[in-house]
């Protein structure tokens, strides 16, 4: 009986009910579509960055800065002898015994591969164009084990670094800015006075703008000579069995080795903060829409209660309890939430598929030929639960208000 009465009241205000359902539908659809879009761009950035730059970086910086022994002894204010103006000994930053360290790292649980790098900034010139590029000296065979940069080469080949004495693989953005093409010869100059010419043997495109527009690869020996870092390795790249656990692995590795170790999350912390802010903004927008939809439900149920005060009194006089009356009106709110959420889930799926087909060139933090949509079951579940909670809470007040009416007082007031 309670179900029949509730559904009868539910259908009594069709126009207002449809508006409330539409509000819930729009909120759910918007959340699913916006979250899929934000997740698509963040997933693209994370995957491409991780795959092209490695999971963990072991840098040439010591884990702790050592205080010179003379400074410890003779700069004490209570000491009889004091030394001022002590100049620290010039220290060449490098990783000591890199081959031995890499062999040790490869044996650690979770580490699947390790590769040496020497890095530095150089000025690249081609014709009248000049830009600053981060040069990375690598051993091609080892580099392709820790990153997928070889698979990102869209013109030429990464393996040509080995077969070409002066070979250079540059990012798509670097080549575009310079106006250079495959097999063109460009000039590289370092701040230490090193200068050389190199032939472009490959052009890679990861889709991540900071990488494509600022990075170039050359043979390890050639880079060491150019940067005046002969026989120096200043970075070791590690690949793990699960990049999501890179932070935990990095902490373990740093406690073992004497060098600062960064996970990809730490290296890209600023970019990850941007994506977190975007997620928060998405939540605020869809949350605001849900609040509006909830107020719509609240409004229509209050109107329904006020219009049917006499009916409520009659129902109570026939033996319906407060719980029954509460159930009747609460069920109407739940019905609006269920129908609106269900339609919203369907529309959300349709919206994602439509957005995927839109031909649009995007070039910002991530370069793409269309909108990147990342679809997860959690998006649908979250949207459904949030909508149901919001609408149900909105229905509680009018339902309890209806249950509090005293049939005797209502009948007296009616006369």
Give the ranges of each region predicted by the language model.
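Mechanotransmission and gating elements of multispan inner-membrane complexes involved in transport
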Residues: 62, 174, 182, 187-282, ...
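Hydrophobic alpha-helical transmembrane segments of multi-pass inner-membrane transport and secretion
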Residues: 14-41, 276-311, 334-343, 389-393
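Short helix-loop junctions at transmembrane helix boundaries
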Residues: 342-383, 396, 400-404
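Short acidic/glycine-enriched loop/turn elements at secondary-structure junctions
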Residues: 90-94, 98-199, 225-226
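Short cytosolic juxtamembrane segments of multi-pass membrane proteins
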Residues: 401-415
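Hydrophobic, regular-secondary-structure patches
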Residues: 38-132
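Transmembrane alpha-helical interface segments in multi-pass membrane proteins
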Residues: 302-304, 310-356, 382, 398
């Amino acid at each position: 009986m309670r179900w029949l009465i509730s559904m009868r009241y539910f259908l009594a205000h069709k126009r207002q009910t449809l508006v409330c359902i539409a509000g819930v539908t729009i909120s759910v659809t918007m959340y699913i579509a916006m979250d899929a879009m934000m997740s698509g761009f963040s997933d693209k950035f994370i995957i491409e960055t991780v795959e092209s730059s490695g999971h963990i970086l072991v840098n040439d910086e010591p884990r702790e800065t050592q205080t010179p022994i003379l400074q410890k002894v003779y700069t004490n204010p209570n000491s009889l002898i004091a030394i001022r103006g002590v100049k620290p000994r010039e220290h060449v930053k490098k990783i000591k015994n890199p081959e031995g360290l890499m062999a040790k790292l490869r044996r650690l649980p979770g580490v699947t591969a390790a590769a040496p790098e020497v890095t530095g900034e150089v000025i690249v010139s081609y014709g009248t164009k000049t830009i600053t590029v981060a040069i990375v000296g690598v051993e091609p065979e080892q580099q392709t084990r820790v990153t997928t940069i070889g698979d990102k080469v869209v013109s030429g080949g990464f393996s040509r670094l080995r077969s070409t004495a002066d070979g250079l693989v540059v990012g798509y953005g670097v080549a575009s800015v310079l106006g250079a093409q495959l097999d063109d010869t460009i000039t590289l100059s370092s701040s230490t006075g090193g200068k050389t010419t190199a032939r472009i043997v490959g052009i890679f495109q990861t889709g991540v703008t900071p990488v494509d527009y600022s990075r170039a690869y050359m043979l390890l020996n050639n880079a060491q000579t150019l940067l005046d870092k002969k026989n120096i390795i200043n970075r070791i790249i590690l690949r793990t069995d699960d990049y999501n656990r890179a932070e935990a692995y990095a902490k373990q590795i740093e406690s073992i080795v004497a060098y600062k170790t960064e996970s990809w999350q730490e290296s890209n912390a600023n970019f990850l903060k941007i994506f977190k802010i975007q997620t928060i903004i998405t939540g605020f927008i869809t949350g605001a829409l849900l609040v509006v939809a909830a107020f719509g439900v609240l409004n229509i149920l209050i109107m329904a209660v006020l219009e049917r005060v006499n009916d409520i009194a009659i129902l109570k006089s026939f033996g319906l309890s407060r719980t029954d009356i509460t159930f009747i009106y609460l069920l109407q709110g739940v019905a609006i939430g269920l129908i609106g959420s269900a339609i919203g889930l369907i529309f959300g799926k349709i919206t994602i598929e439509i957005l995927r087909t839109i031909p649009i060139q995007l070039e910002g933090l991530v370069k793409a030929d269309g909108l990147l949509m990342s679809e997860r079951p959690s998006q649908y579940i979250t949207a459904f639960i949030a909508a149901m909670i919001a609408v149900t809470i909105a229905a509680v007040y009018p339902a309890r208000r209806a249950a509090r009416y005293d049939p005797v007082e209502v009948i007296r007031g009616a006369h």
